[in-house]
Design a protein with these regions (language model features):
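Single-stranded RNA-binding surfaces
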Residues: 1-213, 217
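Short, ordered, surface-exposed loop/turn motifs in non-cytosolic proteins
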Residues: 221-222
Length: 222
């Protein structure tokens, strides 16, 4: 079976079509919003290091800088940093996570001063929306939730929701996902995946990978 994904990016919306043997099997259309909501991913710029807080302020294009603590860089920050350099070196070429190198984990007791530099560009995801006078709260440990699955780059583990109580079903889902998941991705199987066929899960997985290869990228304002 030959799979093909077509992505049409317009000013106000993005359309994604999944074809199998030239036959349309799934179609999605999403609006492009400028709102800073939880889950959005941005190419941000470090604005100010705060050694006393072991944190920094980051510009994601919002009127107020976002807050990023050292611990929210995540264990795979080194891998994300190298990946971003490879992606930005040739913006016309897609560089999937599955082809990226996994570097040693970031030290848990490290500091922003030795890890980040003012003006450095980083990939971030919003985990808390702006409130009143505060900007968004960020993480660099990206996750991509779908209806059935949550994908996590540079991980490898497959976990099944604890709400799926059947040992047989948990084993089935774990074995199934391990057989179809791409390299360099960890997966969390959500409760609603219980009883789903491999075709349904594989279809969502393929569409999720397209979203991941073209993340929302809002250039930080210098």
């Amino acid at each position: 079976m030959t799979s093909e994904v077509i992505v049409d990016v317009q000013t106000k919306e993005i359309s994604i079509a999944l074809l199998e043997d030239k036959r349309l099997v799934e179609f999605q259309k999403e609006g492009r919003s400028a709102s800073f909501v939880v889950g959005n991913i941005y190419l941000a710029k470090v604005r100010k290091l705060m050694p006393g807080l072991n944190a920094c302020f980051v510009n994601v294009g919002y009127e107020r800088d976002a807050f990023l603590h050292y611990l929210d860089l995540g264990s795979k920050f080194n891998s994300y940093t190298k990946y971003l350099k490879q992606v930005t070196s040739d913006k016309k070429k897609l560089y999937p996570f599955s082809k990226a190198s996994i570097l040693p984990d970031l030290e848990k007791d490290g500091s922003v001063q030795t890890t980040l530099q003012q003006g450095q560009e980083i990939l971030v995801q919003i985990v808390k929306e702006p409130i009143s006078t505060k900007g968004p709260r960020l993480t660099c440990e990206l996750s991509f939730p779908g209806r059935f699955l949550v994908l996590m780059p540079f991980q490898d583990k497959v976990s099944v929701s604890s709400k799926i109580q059947s040992a047989e079903e948990r084993a089935r889902l774990k074995q199934l996902i391990q057989s179809i998941k791409p390299k360099n991705f960890g997966v969390i199987v959500r409760t609603v995946a219980e009883g789903k066929r491999v075709a349904e899960l594989d279809s969502e997985l393929k569409l999720s990978l397209i979203h991941i290869s073209e993340p929302t990228r809002q250039e930080a304002i210098s």
